[in-house]
């Protein structure tokens, strides 16, 4: 009695798969395997063997005459491939006695672009084994064809190209086709060339442009960062200084640098006008002039830095020139009652501008409220603490002896009464 598995044993699945696979059918690759050969592998291991009629290891490249179809019809005729497809295709001559290939297709033509790229062997000899040419498909007829996204890479052997060049040089026609009438000439240029077809997409380029735009927006936002941290750092620096004396020492006695103008943010930072306690309260982030002015008005007593502003600076700075437009020249015949302009006066030289008058800090001596204790040059910025008496002190009215001496040191001229000018408007 024969055992059931003695003679009727089944072949392994791999053997059955080889038996079921027919010549010309698509190969069955295991999951994860892709057919992605290099240019050298395509020429050496596939095109050379195909031209020499040597059997290929697998039937993975179909034999199709590419110029009888449009490129969008070729994927369904390929044996293998998802995004790119490989074919063995013959090439015909464009003219019977020429060496130029015929690139015409069904509804368009293939146009060569760029220069031919030589394909070198990877051995020590580094010999040239083939040539690679890139072509683009155009709809319509030349030269008014419409460019498409279909690309072809054509691989040919160097021996074939050299023989074709020899034929073109000697102008010897190819052998006639046997059985043809009147000795018809064969238009076959190459028996086989290997072609790779794929469609170019712009998704990667669009995504890259989108990422570049996002990066540029982020860079712009980072470049225009809020300046609150910078202002907080400046306020903390005021708080860390040792009162007004520390500020004066830091500036080397030149109080003209106590007013800092930030041209990028259009804000003004006044350093040294507040006490250490006031500056410590502002260290949390005072970033605008209105907050600084409110804190100055809320001060209980005048700070020492305000009084020290009466001392002359080594390099006098014209505050009116920095904050006010240049004054117009007033004719000497103008007259108006003093109630319109009070007791204010200007330099006796009428043609001098207001920028030559200098600056004097105001200290009305009202220590109870401290609201009037502010430098005169802050008033053009809109600080409400400047009063009518401050205007008098600015323009050279009656001042204490110390203030008069400071005014003389700041190049003040003799008072001159102006009329028909309303300085309060």
From Swiss-Prot:
SUPFAM superfamilies: NAC domain (SSF101941)
Domain of life: Eukaryota
DNA-binding region: 129-206
Main localization, broad class: nucleus
Keyword entries, A-Z: DNA-binding, Nucleus, Transcription, Transcription regulation
BP term (GO), one: system development
Molecular-function annotations in GO: DNA binding
Keyword Nucleotide-binding assigned: no
Start and end residues of each stretch annotated as Disordered: 1-34
Function summary: Transcription factor of the NAC family associated with male fertility.
Protein name: NAC transcription factor ONAC010
Organism of provenance: Oryza sativa subsp. indica
